[in-house]
Amino acid sequence: CGRGSSGHAAAEMEMRFMRIGVDIDSLLDNDLIRMRTIFQTKESLVFGISISGETEDVLYLLRESHKRGAKTVLITAKYDDTLYEFCTEVVQIPSLQHLNQGHVISPQFPILLILDIIYSSYNELDRQTKESLHHNTLQALADGWAKTGKKEKNHDY
């Protein structure tokens, strides 16, 4: 989950992992973020993304999910030992001054880099199965486009 640029990165993460068979949701809406805490269990892995490390809804989800036994990971530019009270892991990303305002470098850049590393590492586990799933999602899209008579869309899936 995440808000703003962090939320957009979460949506990108959902799209990529969903295509290789991971049951994943990205949450960008404050109310949905809070409601989803109820469904977290010890079987859950919850990622929160907040460049500032201070987005209250993201921290709420991580805190409450942790209380329910879920593994929790925060991706942030903030270093604060107290985050480990409710985060199984804290992945610190580089931050430039004013990065969260997106004037010079997209705030998503360091987040997407970390997500690419996580995705690549996960994808290496049983790579053949994941490549097959990815291919099957491409085929499902192509079949849908063929049925509707639409030309294939240019997406970077």
Predicted stretch roles:
Residues 1-113, 119-127:
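Glycine-rich phosphate-binding loops that contact phosphosugars or nucleotide phosphates
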Residues 128-157:
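A short, charged, Gly/Pro-tolerant segment at domain boundaries
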